Regions:
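Intrinsically disordered, low-complexity segments enriched in serine/proline and basic residues
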Residues: 2, 20-23, 30
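Short hydrophobic targeting helices and cationic amphipathic motifs
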Residues: 5, 12-13, 24
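Residue-identity detector for glycine
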Residues: 9, 28-31
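Short terminal hydrophobic/aromatic SLiMs and anchors at protein ends
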Residues: 14-15, 31
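NTP/phosphate- and nucleic-acid-binding module
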Residues: 30-442
């Protein structure tokens, strides 16, 4: 009987290991890395940033092992950086799904014939294309945006007023041959963007949905920790009188914004003039000037693309009408760079909890401290980055500050003498001893 129970226990032990392995595999497949021991990663931190990386966000993210620079404006995302990106994407997805957004993935390879219908394949009109010759003849471009392709796609699926409204979005890599690509991941030649497009039967319905997106964007930036991101009046170009941008106040930003005392009115430089201010009952003496980095924008496109590309629907009286459109963008990789740049201090990165790759940075010191740290790590792999390297404690502490995870937990022979762990908060630097019985890792 004893032998049987022992065999049964061994069986369940291996079943548990198999289930855990499968769970890790599934989670890893979707880009969520949950078993992260420093000793088992290829990540290495750097004391100094590469000489050609002058932007603070790029320098810190490189030093901390989040990204790797290939060339100007082109970066690889390493495991920790990818995890930050996935958390940003998850927040965006959740809020857009709430307002009826449906996720798609369009090809990056673009047919010139489609773009020539709007005049936007010409280098004189759009000078940021990456273009290439196709084997066998012809030309292709790498998409800098997707207004034309999504409009053309919807011609297959929108034919009646009953098919409207509809909203689709994607989160994918864009390519722009930028002349200035020297701001880390704030401005790249290859970058990750969320672009959403909505389609409507009437202008009233476009306005209704536009308002829903405004509210969703406010929730997104709040959750990302970018609480001083303000909806800003900008030029609507040929689409409408105004569009809206979402700049985050940032000393190294490329934009200039003007805001009143309670920031209920914010204008970009392009529309900041007496005529516009008079429309809002304001005057220049009410406003302050600051620099900012744009992390999103929204436009009422109306018929800008649906008309030349022939996107129409039959209304209730069976008359052909042109579809109204809106477009809504968020620079996902730029958001990551802005967060890195904005919250960093002289020791390194400081991630808001919602986007941090891991909430906790765990350190074990000494034989007993390391053993206890292993126990704390077990079962908490999804929220804990475990620095189990055989290096000096000071090196671990410096790397924890450089990498910027919100909470550091240190278990040492010394803290165990008090049956406690030392908990340090990255944002404030506050440290305290917490009894192990009261230490909640969640």
């Amino acid at each position: 009987m004893a032998r049987f129970l022992k065999l049964l226990g061994t069986y369940f032990y291996y079943i548990t290991l198999m289930v855990k392995s499968q769970c890790l595999s599934l989670l890893g497949r979707y880009g969520i890395i949950i078993d992260m021991r420093f000793s088992q990663t290829f990540i290495k931190t750097l004391r100094e940033a590469p000489k050609d990386e002058i932007a603070k966000n790029g320098a810190l993210l490189t030093r901390a092992g989040y990204i790797h620079k290939e060339l100007a404006g082109v970066y690889d995302y390493l495991p920790l950086g990818l995890r930050v990106l996935e958390k940003i994407k998850a927040i965006i997805r959740e809020e857009l799904n709430k307002i009826g957004g449906q996720e798609v993935m369009l090809t990056a390879l673009q047919n010139p014939e489609l773009w020539e219908k709007t005049g936007r394949f010409s280098d004189q009109q759009v000078d940021i294309w990456f273009k290439t010759e196709v084997t066998g003849g012809g030309e292709l471009g790498l998409a800098p945006t997707h207004e034309e392709p999504i409009t053309n796609l919807m011609k297959t699926y929108i034919s009646s007023y009953k098919d409207l409204p509809v909203s689709v979005y994607q989160i994918q890599t864009k390519f722009r041959n930028e002349k200035r690509a020297k701001s880390g991941i704030l401005r790249g030649r290859e970058f990750i963007m969320k672009d959403m497009y909505s389609f409507h039967a009437t202008e009233e319905d476009l306005n209704r949905y536009y308002s829903e997106v405004e509210k969703a964007y406010a929730r997104i930036y709040e959750r990302l920790g970018l609480t001083d991101t303000y909806e800003t009046f900008a030029s609507g170009g040929i689409f409408s009188k105004y569009s809206h941008e979402y700049p985050t106040l940032l000393p190294v930003g490329e934009d200039t914004v003007y805001y009143n005392a309670d920031k209920s009115l914010v204008f970009n430089k392009e529309v900041y003039n007496d005529e516009v201010l008079a429309e809002f009952g304001a005057k220049k003496s009410d406003f302050s000037e600051d620099t900012a980095a744009e992390v999103g924008n929204i436009f009422k496109l109306k018929f800008k693309y649906s008309e030349p590309l022939g996107l129409q629907f039959s209304d209730a009286e069976n008359r052909l009408q042109t579809v109204y459109m809106g477009c809504y963008g968020i620079g996902v990789s730029r958001v990551m760079g802005v967060i890195a740049e904005k919250f960093a201090d002289d020791k390194g990165l400081v991630w808001p909890e919602e986007v941090a790759p891991f909430k906790y940075y765990l350190v074990g010191i000494g034989a007993e401290g390391s053993k206890k740290a292993e126990e704390l790590y077990a079962g908490n792999e999804d929220v804990v980055f475990f620095d189990d390297r055989d290096v000096r404690p000071g090196e671990k502490f410096a790397d924890s500050e450089l990498m910027g995870m919100p909470v550091r937990i240190v278990v040492s022979d010394k803290t165990l003498a008090e049956d406690a762990a030392e908990v340090t908060f990255r944002k404030t630097g506050e440290s305290k001893l917490v009894k192990l019985s009261e230490l909640a890792i969640d």
